[in-house]
Curated annotation (Swiss-Prot):
Its EC number is 2.3.3.8. Keywords: Acyltransferase, ATP-binding, Cytoplasm, Lipid biosynthesis, Lipid metabolism, Lyase, Magnesium, Metal-binding, Nucleotide-binding, Transferase. InterPro entries: Cit_synth/succinyl-CoA_lig_AS (IPR017440), Citrate_synth-like_lrg_a-sub (IPR016142), Citrate_synth-like_sm_a-sub (IPR016143), Citrate_synthase (IPR002020), Citrate_synthase_sf (IPR036969), Citrt_syn/SCS-alpha_CS (IPR033847), NAD(P)-bd_dom_sf (IPR036291), Succ-CoA_synthase_bsu_CS (IPR017866). ATP citrate-lyase is the primary enzyme responsible for the synthesis of cytosolic acetyl-CoA, used for the elongation of fatty acids and biosynthesis of isoprenoids, flavonoids and malonated derivatives. May supply substrate to the cytosolic acetyl-CoA carboxylase, which generates the malonyl-CoA used for the synthesis of a multitude of compounds, including very long chain fatty acids and flavonoids. In contrast to all known animal ACL enzymes having a homomeric structure, plant ACLs are composed of alpha and beta chains. It comes from Oryza sativa subsp. japonica (Rice). Mg(2+) binds at E231. GO terms for molecular function: ATP binding; ATP citrate synthase activity; lyase activity; metal ion binding. GO terms for biological process: acetyl-CoA biosynthetic process; fatty acid biosynthetic process. ATP binds at residues 214-234, 265-291. This is ATP-citrate synthase beta chain protein 1. The active site is at H273. CDD domains: CCL_ACL-C. CoA binds at L292, K293, D294, A295, G296, A297, V298, V299, P300, T301, S302.
Length: 608
C-alpha cells in the first residue's frame, strides 16, 4: 500500500445506497472547507435513477442517482472513492464490484459484520490491484479541509471545534470510529490539528491496517507526526512495531493501545468490536504498548496521559523548527435547515396546505379527530367515514345508512350508459385501470349523473321561495333550462325507477322531515302532465333527499347547507358510487380478454 495521500480538495466520491444525512454532512463539510465542487459526484441506488436534491451551502443542487455501479462509474470517471453504505449482507458483493471498476481507487465499507471470508477476498483483490480499502465496520476517514467520508467526525459543530475545516500537521489512525472523534478533539486542543484521520474499523480483518496508513502518512510532507490508537486483540499493531524497528517510519509516532483493564477479568473479554477481545498475552494491550515503546514510539503510561504525550511531541517539533504555525481561518457559517430552525423556534414559516379533515402525524391516522382504531373497533361503516371526511362530523346512523344506500344504488347501471361504455372501450384498448376509470368518470356531468347538485340547488331555491310547482317549472322553461332531476330515457309514469322508490321509502321511515322530497314529488306530478317520461329520476331523488338529510339532522346551519350544495358534495357521492361499477366493467373486460372495440358502420349515419 504505502504511497501517500489518498484524498485531496478535488476528490469526489460515489455513494452507494442513498442515505440523506451522511451525504448532506459531506456536502456541508465541503462548503465549510471552501470546496468549489461537491465531494459527492453521484449516488448509486440499485434499481433507481434520477436525481436527489441536497444542499451545497445555500444552494440546492441535484445529484444524479444511478441504478448500477457500472453506470455511475461511466457517468463520473473522475470519482475515485466508493463509499459503501450497504448492509452487511450485500456489502461484500457491491464492494468487489466497485474494486473491479478501473476508476475506483479507494473503497470505504461502513457495514459491520461482513463475513470474514468475504473480507479476505476483498483484501486480496485490493492488494493485487493496488487499491485501498477502509473498513469494514468503519466510520470512514477525513482529510482536514479537503474531504470526508460519510459521518466521519460527526456534526458540523464538532468539526469546527476540532478545527477539521483546515489542515494541521498530525496524521491519525485508529481502529475505533467513536474514539477517533474523541481523538480529533484531543489533537486539536494540544496541536495545530490533524492533516488526515482514518478509522480502519473494528473487524478482525481490516481492509487496511494501522501500519499501512502510518507508512502512508510518513510519505506525506505535510504530516509531521503521527498518532495511533490501537486496541487489544489481534496482532495488527505488531506490523507497526516491525516498521518502526526497520526504520521505515522517520517521523515521531505517539501510540496507545486501549484495553489494559482486560487483565482485571478472570476470563476472556469481548469489547465493542469483533476484533477487540482479550486472547493470549501477545494480544494484550500491555504487551502491545510495551512492544511499541521498545520500537521507538512515544507510549504514555495511561490513556489519560496520551494528551500530554501528544502535546509534548508536537511542541518539540515546533521548537526544532519542523512545524510552522498554521494560519487560522474563520470557516463560513453553514445555513441552518428550515426544519431545524423551526423546531428550535428560531424562525417561523407559513404553511402551504391547510387540512382540517385528517391528521397522520400521530401513532395512527385520525379522521376528523376520530382515531383509526376507534373507527375499526366501533364498527364504523363507509357512510360514517364519509361523514367524517366530507362533513367533518359524525352524522346519525340513519344519515350514514342513507349515504351507503345511495352508493349501492348508484354503483352501476349496466354497460350501456355513457360512463360504463367509455370505461369498457378504454379497457378494450388495452389501457390500465386508472385510465379506464377516468375515461368513464369524465362523462359525468349535466346529462349523466352530474345533475344531483343542480337538482338540489333548484329544488331548494324554489321551495325556500315558496314557488308552486307550476311557477317553478314554467319559470325554468322561460329561462330555457331543463329541470334537473326530472326526466329519464327509459323510465316513465308506468315504469318507475326502483332506485327512487327505495330511497323514498327509506326516507319516509327514518327521516324526521321530507319537505324537499315532497316538493320534488309535487314537481314530478306537474311535469308528468306534460310528458309520460318526465319522472323524478335518481339524481332528483338523491338531491332532494340530501337536502332533507342536511336540514332535518339539525347538525348543519343554513349557511353550511348552502355551501355544501354549492361546492358539489352531492355529485361527489355519485362519482364515488359509480367508480365501483366503472372499475367492475374494466375488470370484466380484461378478464374476458375482449378485443379492441370498433363501432359498427351500420350504426352510424353518414351524411353530408
Amino acid at each position: 500500500m504505502a504511497t501517500g495521500q489518498i484524498f485531496s480538495k478535488t476528490t469526489q466520491a460515489l455513494f452507494y445506497n442513498y442515505k440523506q444525512l451522511p451525504i448532506q454532512r459531506m456536502l456541508d463539510f465541503d462548503f465549510l472547507c471552501g470546496r468549489e465542487t461537491p465531494s459527492v459526484a453521484g449516488i448509486i441506488n440499485p434499481g433507481s435513477d434520477g436525481f436527489q436534491k441536497l444542499f451545497f451551502g445555500q444552494e440546492e443542487i441535484a445529484i444524479p442517482v444511478h441504478p448500477t455501479i457500472e453506470a455511475a462509474c461511466n457517468a463520473h470517471p473522475t470519482a475515485d472513492v466508493f463509499i459503501n453504505f450497504a448492509s452487511f449482507r450485500s456489502a461484500a458483493a457491491s464492494s468487489m464490484s466497485a474494486l473491479k471498476q478501473p476508476t475506483i481507487r479507494v473503497v470505504a465499507i461502513i457495514a459491520e459484520g461482513v463475513p470474514e471470508s468475504d473480507t479476505k477476498q476483498l483484501i486480496s483483490y485490493a492488494r493485487a490491484n493496488n487499491k485501498v480499502i477502509i473498513g469494514p465496520a468503519t466510520v470512514g476517514g477525513i482529510q482536514a479541509g479537503a474531504f470526508k467520508i460519510g459521518d466521519t467526525a460527526g456534526t458540523i459543530d464538532n468539526i469546527i471545534q476540532c478545527k477539521l475545516y483546515r489542515p494541521g500537521s498530525v496524521g491519525f489512525v485508529s481502529k475505533s470510529g467513536g474514539m477517533s472523534n474523541e481523538m480529533y478533539n484531543t489533537i486539536a486542543r494540544v496541536t495545530d490539528g490533524i492533516y488526515e484521520g482514518i478509522a480502519i474499523g473494528g473487524d478482525v480483518f481490516p481492509g487496511s491496517t494501522l501500519s499501512d496508513h502510518i507508512l502512508r502518512f510518513n510519505n506525506i510532507p505535510q504530516v509531521k507526526m503521527m498518532v495511533v490508537l490501537g486496541e487489544l486483540g489481534g496482532k495488527d499493531e505488531y506490523s507497526l512495531v516491525e516498521a518502526l524497528k526497520q526504520g521505515k517510519v522517520q517521523k515521531p509516532v505517539v501510540a496507545w493501545v486501549s484495553g489494559t483493564c482486560a487483565r482485571l477479568f478472570k476470563s476472556e473479554v469481548q469489547f465493542g468490536h469483533a476484533g477487540a477481545k482479550s486472547g493470549g498475552e501477545l494480544e494484550s494491550a500491555q504487551a502491545k504498548n510495551q512492544a511499541l515503546k521498545d520500537a521507538g514510539a512515544v507510549v504514555p503510561t495511561s490513556y489519560e496521559a496520551l494528551e500530554t504525550a501528544i502535546k509534548e511531541t508536537f511542541e518539540k517539533l515546533v521548537e526544532d523548527g519542523k512545524i510552522s504555525p498554521v494560519t487560522e481561518i474563520t470557516p463560513p457559517p453553514i445555513p441552518e435547515d428550515l426544519k431545524t430552525a423551526i423546531k428550535s423556534g428560531k424562525v417561523r414559516a407559513p404553511t402551504h396546505i391547510i387540512s382540517t379533515i385528517s391528521d397522520d402525524r400521530g401513532e395512527e391516522p385520525c379522521y376528523a379527530g376520530v382515531p383509526m382504531s376507534t373507527i375499526i373497533e366501533q364498527g364504523y361503516g363507509v357512510g360514517d367515514v364519509i361523514s367524517l371526511l366530507w362533513f367533518k362530523r359524525s352524522l346519525p346512523r340513519y344519515c350514514t345508512q342513507f349515504i351507503e344506500m345511495c352508493i349501492m344504488l348508484c354503483a352501476d347501471h349496466g354497460p350501456c350508459v355513457s360512463g360504463a361504455h367509455n370505461s369498457i372501450v378504454t379497457a378494450r384498448a388495452g389501457k390500465d385501470l386508472v385510465s379506464s376509470l377516468v375515461s368513464g368518470l369524465l362523462t359525468i356531468g349535466p346529462r349523466f349523473g352530474g345533475a344531483i347538485d343542480d337538482a338540489a340547488r333548484y329544488f331548494k331555491d324554489a321551495y325556500d321561495r315558496n314557488l308552486t310547482p307550476y311557477e317553478f317549472v314554467e319559470g325554468m322553461k322561460k329561462k330555457g333550462i331543463r329541470v334537473p332531476g326530472i326526466g329519464h330515457r327509459i323510465k316513465s309514469r308506468d315504469n318507475r325507477d326502483k332506485r327512487v322508490q327505495l330511497l323514498q321509502k327509506y326516507a319516509h321511515t327514518h327521516f324526521p322531515s321530507v319537505k324537499y322530497m315532497e316538493y320534488a314529488v309535487q314537481v314530478e306530478t306537474y311535469t308528468l302532465s306534460k310528458a309520460n317520461n318526465l319522472v323524478l329520476n335518481v339524481d332528483g331523488a338523491i338531491g332532494s333527499l340530501f337536502l332533507d338529510l342536511l336540514s332535518g339532522s339539525g347538525m348543519f346551519s343554513k349557511q353550511e347547507i348552502d355551501e355544501i350544495v354549492e361546492i358539489g358534495y352531492l355529485n361527489g357521492l355519485f362519482v364515488l358510487a359509480r367508480s365501483i361499477g366503472l372499475i367492475g366493467h374494466t375488470f370484466d373486460q380484461k378478464r374476458l380478454k375482449q378485443p379492441l372495440y370498433r363501432h359498427p358502420w351500420e350504426d352510424v349515419l353518414y351524411t353530408k
